Amino acid sequence: MKSASTVVATRILGLDPGLRITGFGVIDKLGNQLRYVASGCIRTRDGELPGRLKTLLDGVREVVAAYTPDQVAVEKVFVNVNPQSTLLLGQARGAVICGAVSCDLPVHEYTALQVKQAVVGYGKAAKEQVQHMVQRLLALDGCPSPDAADALACAICHAHGGQGTAGAFAGRRRAGRILVAPDPG
């Protein structure tokens, strides 16, 4: 009879904030291995900004309740040519971060360059390259949607020890989850 060894897995929720569509991706990190758990999008309807921000906040809380992550990785805002778009994206990002922090999760931030470098090996990679590498790294049958792929890429970046900023947005740390795996010996 083989004995079982205990492996501690860390569940990471990656978020790619957007006012219309916020991508989410959930992975488990077991040692050096990554395992896909889930991904999808939180969509807001056209309408008043406060209602859309509430949809994002509630959506993140629902994802956290469904998948119980230990940590959260969020892509930082890039400065757009259009200042109004940048402000709206910043507000959406704030709602997403508040959703995670209100669930007592530590939030780590990464630039798009850091995420692409960690996943593709090139900081200026195209979205299609990110999608393809996410599919390969997580052994997915098909390519995830661009928003979900970006969120999964953010989670992968964090899992690979990306140098995100956890300072001001850190909630209380959660312990990893315990999984039992058969002893290979």
UniProtKB/Swiss-Prot annotation:
Q: What stretches pass through the bilayer?
A: none
Catalytic residues, chain numbering: D16, E75, D147
So where does Mg(2+) 2 get bound?
A: E75
Q: Top enzyme class of this protein?
A: hydrolase
Cofactor needs: Mg(2+)
Q: Where in the cell?
A: Cytoplasm
- One GO cellular component term noted in the UniProt record for this chain: Holliday junction resolvase complex
Protein name, UniProt field: Crossover junction endodeoxyribonuclease RuvC
Organism whose genome encodes this protein: Aromatoleum aromaticum (strain DSM 19018 / LMG 30748 / EbN1) (Azoarcus sp. (strain EbN1))
